[in-house]
Regions:
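Asp-based, Mg2+/Mn2+-dependent phosphohydrolase catalytic module
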Residues: 1-4, 66-85, 93-123, 127-152
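Hydrophobic alpha-helical segments that mediate membrane insertion or helix-helix packing
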Residues: 10, 53, 133-134
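Short, flexible/disordered intra-domain loops and linkers
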Residues: 20-22, 26, 60-66, 95-98
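A short alpha-helix capping/helix-coil boundary motif
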Residues: 17-20, 52-55, 87, 108-111
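Short, active-site-adjacent cap segments at secondary-structure transitions
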Residues: 12-13, 57-60, 93-95, 130-131
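Short glycine-rich loop/turn motifs that provide flexible caps or phosphate-binding loops at active sites
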Residues: 9, 56, 124
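Active-site neighborhood of HAD-like aspartate-dependent phosphohydrolases
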Residues: 1-50
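Substrate-recognition element of Asp-dependent hydrolases with the DxDx(T/V) motif
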Residues: 37-72, 83, 87-92
Length: 152
């Protein structure tokens, strides 16, 4: 089974000026889809779609894992329920975990869980850490979000 692995912030949803997902006064993440995301992904609803996201704000106490999970469910709702699953790394770079991109942990965990053929799969992201994680996991192809979603 081939999968489409997707980064979250800056790939699927908008960032604020400090390159974070915006939050409301309660700290809830505000999920606003970037242009063309829903239109591009909707026809691919029969593919495995797996989101992998670094969310160091959890360990920094900016927001909770529950708030990130709520945001992921809101994202899936906005996309019409087409996401197969997701993995969230709550660690900071200093934690030196195996899941935080550019390491491969989140991708390989999801691949094992869903029986994914990594070589036949694609990763879409907006940063070099996404490309490096895909490469480390053995994902067959990486495409930058601006190219995949046709942003100028």
């Amino acid at each position: 089974n081939a999968a489409l692995f997707l980064d979250l912030a800056g790939t699927l949803v908008e960032l604020d000026d400090s390159r974070n997902i915006p939050r409301n006064s309660r700290g809830d993440l505000i999920i606003k889809l970037l242009p063309n995301v829903a239109d591009k992904l909707a026809p691919m609803h029969d593919h495995l779609m797996l989101v992998v996201t670094n969310q160091a704000g959890v360990n920094r106490k900016w927001f909770t894992m529950e708030q990130v999970e709520d945001a992921m469910r809101a994202l899936d709702d906005q996309l019409g329920g087409i996401l197969t699953g997701w993995q969230i790394c709550p660690h900071t770079p200093d934690d030196n975990c195996e899941c935080r991109k550019p390491k491969a942990g989140m991708i390989t965990d999801l691949a094992e869980l869903y029986g994914v053929d990594l070589r036949a799969s694609t990763m879409v992201g907006d940063q070099e850490v996404d490309e490096l994680a895909a490469e480390a996991a053995g994902v067959g192809r990486f495409i930058y979000a601006r190219d995949f979603f046709g942003w100028d």
